[in-house]
Swiss-Prot record:
Family, per entry: Belongs to the prokaryotic/mitochondrial release factor family.
NCBIfam families: prfA (TIGR00019), PRK00591.1 (NF001859)
Cellular component terms per the entry's GO annotation: cytoplasm
Main location as per UniProt: cytoplasm
Protein name: Peptide chain release factor 1
PTM description: Methylated by PrmC. Methylation increases the termination efficiency of RF1.
GO molecular function: translation release factor activity, codon specific
Superkingdom in the source lineage: Bacteria
Gene3D superfamilies named among the record's database cross-references: 3.30.160.20, 3.30.70.1660, 6.10.140.1950
Keywords: Cytoplasm, Methylation, Protein biosynthesis
Compartment(s) of residence: Cytoplasm
Role, per record: Peptide chain release factor 1 directs the termination of translation in response to the peptide chain termination codons UAG and UAA.
Organism: Legionella pneumophila subsp. pneumophila (strain Philadelphia 1 / ATCC 33152 / DSM 7513)
PTM sites of type N5-methylglutamine: Q237
Length: 362
C-alpha cells in the first residue's frame, strides 16, 4: 500500500477515535444537531476504521510470525511457517477492502436511472439493434431484481425502436449502468441482406440518474408548453378515444419529452415532468463533466452520446469496449443480459483510475 494512502487511513482512524470520545461527552449529547452530525460522521468512518484496525493487527501478527521463524524452538518455527501464508492472504484481502473504502463515492451511485436508446446511422438495422440493446438491458435489470417502467417508445418499421425511454428502479442502479452512455456500434449481416454482407450501424445510449425530489430542479411553469395527443400502439379499445399522451417542451432549452405509457393523462404528465427534470439536470451535469474533462479524461466519459464506446461484432461473436481495450468472445451471453462480463472490468478499471488519482493528490 502506498504511504500516502496509509497516512490517510491513519488520519481517518484518529478522527474515528476522536469522534467516538466526543459522542460520550455530556455537552455534545445535549446539543442534538451536533450529536446528529457527529453520529453520522462516526457511522461513515466506522467501516474503514475497523477494517484498518484489522489490517494493522494482521501486520503485527505477520511480524511476530517472522520472528518465530528465527526461533531455536523447531515446533514454534514450524507453527509459524504454517500460519504465515494464511496471514499474508488476510493482509492482501484487507488491503483490497481498504482501497475500496478509500475510493471517493459517487453521490449518484444509489439513484434510479432513465435509460434512453436511440437508433443512429443504419436505418432499419439500427432500429432493430436498438431493440436488441433494450432487451439486453431489460434482461440484466431483471437479473438484478430491478423494476423497469416504460416511459415512451417509437417503433421501427421492421422491428425494434427508433427511440425508447424507460425508468429503471432498484438498488444502486446508476453505479452499475453509468458506463453505458455513448455510441454502440454493431457489425452483422441483416436478415434482409441476401448477399450475406456485413453492415455497420449504430445506436446511442444515455444513462441519466433520476433527479432527487428533495434536491429538485426548479422549472418556471411559464417556460413550458404542454400538448396532449392520442396514444399510439398497444392498448386495445381504449386507444385513440382520449388524448392521454403528453408532450412537454421546455422553451428556453428546446428540450422535449413525451409520455404515452399510461392511460391516465395525469400519470403521463407526472412521468413526463420527472423525465424533463432529469434531462435538464443531466444537461447541466454533462456541461460540468466536459469542463472537468479538459484536465482529466474519465472512463465514465463526458456524457457525450457521440463518443463511440463499444462494438458488437456478431459474425465473430465478439464485443470490444474501446475505452479499456477489452475484448470478449461471449457476445451471445452478453446480449442475453449477462452484462456483468463487461461492467465488472469497467468498474475495476474505473476504481483503479480513482485510486491512482487519490495517490497522486495526497
Amino acid at each position: 500500500m502506498k504511504k500516502s494512502l496509509e497516512l490517510k487511513l491513519q488520519q481517518m482512524l484518529e478522527r474515528y477515535e476522536e469522534v467516538g470520545r466526543l459522542l460520550s461527552e455530556a455537552s455534545i449529547i445535549a446539543d442534538q444537531n451536533q450529536f446528529k452530525s457527529l453520529s453520522k460522521e462516526y457511522a461513515q468512518l466506522e467501516p474503514v476504521s475497523q477494517c484498518y484496525e484489522s489490517y494493522l493487527e494482521a501486520k503485527n501478527n505477520l511480524d511476530s510470525l517472522n520472528e518465530l521463524l528465527e526461533s531455536d524452538d523447531k515446533d514454534l518455527a514450524t507453527m509459524a511457517e504454517e500460519e504465515i501464508d494464511t496471514v499474508k492472504k488476510q493482509i492482501e484481502e484487507l488491503d483490497e477492502q481498504l482501497q475500496w473504502h478509500l475510493i471517493p463515492k459517487d453521490p449518484d451511485d444509489e439513484r434510479n436511472i432513465y435509460l434512453e436508446v436511440r437508433a443512429g446511422t443504419g436505418g432499419d438495422e439500427a432500429a432493430i439493434f436498438a431493440g436488441d440493446l433494450f432487451r439486453m438491458y431489460s434482461r440484466y435489470a431483471e437479473s438484478q431484481g430491478w423494476q423497469i417502467e416504460l416511459i415512451s417508445a417509437s417503433h421501427g418499421e421492421h422491428g425494434g425502436y427508433k427511440e425508447i425511454i424507460a425508468k429503471i428502479s432498484g438498488q444502486a442502479v446508476y453505479s452499475q449502468l453509468k458506463f453505458e452512455s455513448g455510441a454502440h456500434r454493431v457489425q452483422r449481416v441483416p436478415e434482409t441482406e441476401s448477399q450475406g454482407r456485413v453492415h455497420t450501424s449504430a445506436c446511442t445510449v444515455a444513462i441519466m440518474p433520476e433527479v432527487d425530489e428533495i434536491n429538485d430542479i426548479q422549472i418556471n411553469p411559464d417556460d413550458l408548453r404542454i400538448d396532449t395527443y392520442r396514444s399510439s400502439g398497444a392498448g386495445g379499445q381504449h386507444v385513440n378515444k382520449t388524448d392521454s399522451a403528453i408532450r412537454i417542451t421546455h422553451i428556453p432549452t428546446g428540450v422535449v419529452v413525451e409520455c404515452q405509457d399510461e392511460r391516465s393523462q395525469h400519470k403521463n404528465r407526472a412521468k413526463a415532468m420527472s423525465l424533463l427534470k432529469t434531462r435538464l439536470l443531466d444537461a447541466e451535469v454533462s456541461k460540468q463533466k466536459q469542463e472537468q474533462a479538459q484536465t482529466r479524461k474519465s472512463l465514465v466519459g463526458t456524457g457525450d452520446r457521440s463518443e463511440r464506446i463499444r462494438t458488437y461484432n456478431f459474425p465473430q461473436g465478439r464485443l470490444t469496449d474501446h475505452r479499456i481495450n477489452l475484448t470478449i468472445y461471449q457476445l451471445s451471453d452478453i446480449m442475453e443480459g449477462n452484462l456483468s462480463l463487461v461492467i465488472d472490468p469497467l468498474k475495476r478499471e474505473y476504481h483503479a483510475e480513482l485510486l491512482a488519482d487519490l495517490g497522486r493528490h495526497d
